[in-house]
C-alpha cells in the first residue's frame, strides 16, 4: 500500500542578494508570487502541504492568498532562526509513517517528474535527493594553492529531498552543526548512511539573484 505523501515547503529567506523590497518568495513571477507557483507544483502530487514561514511573514502571506484567491490547501507553521530549525519545526506536524519531501520555497520550477521520482524511490530507499551533473570545471582551494578536481565525481544537489518522515524527524533531533547545508547532510550525519540520488530537472533552479528570477520568467512563459 502506497504511503501518504507530504510536502514540507521551507520559505524563510529574506532575499538580500535579490536586492528587492520584499523576501524573494513573495516576488511576482508570471503574475503570481513565487511561493504560490511552488505550492501549485506540489499540490497534485501530495496528500498534504506544510508551509514553514517566519512568524512575521504570516499576516502578509494571508493577505497575498486573499489578493490572488489562492486556494491550494496548506498548513502554515512558524519558522526558526535557521533553515535547520525551520525544518525541525515543520516536521512536528508531519505524522510518522509517511513520506515527506522537503523543498525550498524559491524553487518554483521543479517538475512533476522530479517530484514523483523522489517519492517513488523514497518508497524503496527511504532517503532520496535530486541532483544534476556538473558542467563547469571545478577547482579545490587549499592553503598552498588551488587544484583541478574531476568534475565527473561531483553533482549539485537540489530539492525536494525526500525521506521516511520518522527517519528525518529522528535525524533533526540532533544538535545543529554549521555544515548542515541541507536535509541530506543532517540525515547522513545522524545515521551514517548515504541517500539515494535521482537526476532532477535542469530548470529546478533556486531563485537567489535577479538573473535567476529573469531566467525563471523566461522558462515559465516560453
UniProtKB/Swiss-Prot annotation:
Annotated site residue numbers, Positions MEP for the nucleophilic attack: 151, 206
EC numbers: 2.7.7.60
HAMAP family for this protein: IspD (MF_00108)
Gene Ontology MF terms: 2-C-methyl-D-erythritol 4-phosphate cytidylyltransferase activity
Domain of life: Bacteria
Catalytic activity line of the entry: 2-C-methyl-D-erythritol 4-phosphate + CTP + H(+) = 4-CDP-2-C-methyl-D-erythritol + diphosphate
Function: Catalyzes the formation of 4-diphosphocytidyl-2-C-methyl-D-erythritol from CTP and 2-C-methyl-D-erythritol 4-phosphate (MEP).
Keywords, alphabetical: Isoprene biosynthesis, Nucleotidyltransferase, Transferase
Pathway in which this enzyme or protein is active: Isoprenoid biosynthesis; isopentenyl diphosphate biosynthesis via DXP pathway; isopentenyl diphosphate from 1-deoxy-D-xylulose 5-phosphate: step 2/6
Protein name as it appears in the record: 2-C-methyl-D-erythritol 4-phosphate cytidylyltransferase
NCBIfam families (alphabetical): PRK00155.2-3
Listed GO biological process terms: isopentenyl diphosphate biosynthetic process, methylerythritol 4-phosphate pathway
Disulfide-bonded cysteines: none
Residues flagged as site, Transition state stabilizer: 17, 24
Keyword Transferase assigned: yes
SUPFAM superfamilies reported for this sequence: Nucleotide-diphospho-sugar transferases
Classification via Pfam families: IspD
Organism: Porphyromonas gingivalis (strain ATCC 33277 / DSM 20709 / CIP 103683 / JCM 12257 / NCTC 11834 / 2561)
